[in-house]
Amino acid sequence: MVKQNDKIILAYSGGLDTSVAISWLKDKGYDVVACGIDVGEGKDMDAIKEKALKLGAVSSYMIDAKQEFAEEYALIALQGHTLYEGEYPLVSALSRPLIAKKLVTLAKQEHAVAIAHGCTGKGNDQVRFEVAIHALAPDIKIEAPVRDWHWSREEEIDYAKEHNIPVPINLDSPYSIDENLWGRANECGILEDPWQGAPADAFDRTKALADTPDTPTTLEITFEAGVPVALDGESLNLADLIIKLDQIAGEHGIGRIDHIENRLVGIKSREVYEAPAATVLLKAHKDLEDLTFERELAHFKPIIEQKLADTIYNGLWFSPLMEAMVAFLKQTQQVVNGVVRVQLFKGNVITEGRKSPNSLYDTNLATYTSADSFDQQAAVGFIKLWGLPTQVNAQVQAKAQAEAKTDKAHA
């Protein structure tokens, strides 16, 4: 039961759903506090703030979280090489725990009794938001207006008109889009048919290959302890580096992903993603790890990477397992220092060179020239011992087969 002056924090985007949610929550008796979190969507946050107030929110907060998103969320995805099902760079999944954290912080500040989000009952985000919120504030109430009101799109528009809520002029767009610094996610409309190719208007951050430059761009990316810190020698904070690289790579058509995805809620969904900067950084970072990791670590880390991707996708950011995996990641990154040179061309990221003060590549051991320092005679004993279990097994099996033939002949 909602009491008079009970506050609720609404994750507010400025779109139709959360705009209608302000009125709907007010009808339930709440004082609505709108909260927009900027993780790099490129929206006019001041306009969104004013819109919330005009629609009846008692207060409206806009939080710039781009740098925090880059340094504490996207960076983990980069260092963990997280690709859900080997394809999806966790664009939306990465922002949800940060948004949830900001909502909970504001709820405590405003002494709110509840938090509301604008997710439907069909997607993954409802799970991510609610699990994250209750991990940080176990006893707070959660409202999900869009999931609860059971309206068709037409009924929602009728409600908006009755309550003088502006209907966006792009409402006829068939797509559902979410984006942040790390990439852009697109679904619905013609994309729901997995046989149909994604049309040109489904993309925004990448050029079609036919429209990309006919000459490649070469970049040098500098890493310190696994963190990208410079492009072509220009030092940049991580958020700015991602933004700049996103524009450069997008011009070359890099980072388009068309993926049939197994959602957490049990259905398959066709998703179209654009992640130009993420695609380049993931490639460059992996190449630098290949240069600096010893073999056992290089072979083990992908096991953690897959579990990390699943954990983030499934909304378990604030969990003991996640904390342990992040600690593992941070430990591994101490040697990931150096520069990677990549060529961007016609949708491809090609590594041309890499160097590191922590490189484990020894030219004198690897070369086949007269400078070779590898003791090839040591291979004789190594092969004998390495192959001994296989050799012994073969001898035992051969003996057993011979005895079986003898027994059969005497039977």
Swiss-Prot record:
Identification of the protein by name: Argininosuccinate synthase
Principal subcellular localisation of the protein: cytoplasm
Keywords for the protein's UniProt record, in alphabetical order: Amino-acid biosynthesis, Arginine biosynthesis, ATP-binding, Cytoplasm, Ligase, Nucleotide-binding
Keyword set includes Disulfide bond: no
A Pfam family matched in the record: Arginosuc_synth
Transmembrane segments: none
HAMAP family: Arg_succ_synth_type1
Species for this entry: Lactiplantibacillus plantarum (strain ATCC BAA-793 / NCIMB 8826 / WCFS1)
Catalytic activity: L-citrulline + L-aspartate + ATP = 2-(N(omega)-L-arginino)succinate + AMP + diphosphate + H(+)
PROSITE patterns: ARGININOSUCCIN_SYN_1, ARGININOSUCCIN_SYN_2
Residues involved in L-aspartate binding: 120, 124-125
Localization terms from the record: Cytoplasm
Family as reported in the entry's similarity comment: Belongs to the argininosuccinate synthase family. Type 1 subfamily.
Annotated signal sequence range: none
Residues given in the record as L-citrulline binding sites: 88, 124, 128, 176, 261, 273
GO terms, molecular function: argininosuccinate synthase activity; ATP binding
Pathway listed: Amino-acid biosynthesis; L-arginine biosynthesis; L-arginine from L-ornithine and carbamoyl phosphate: step 2/3
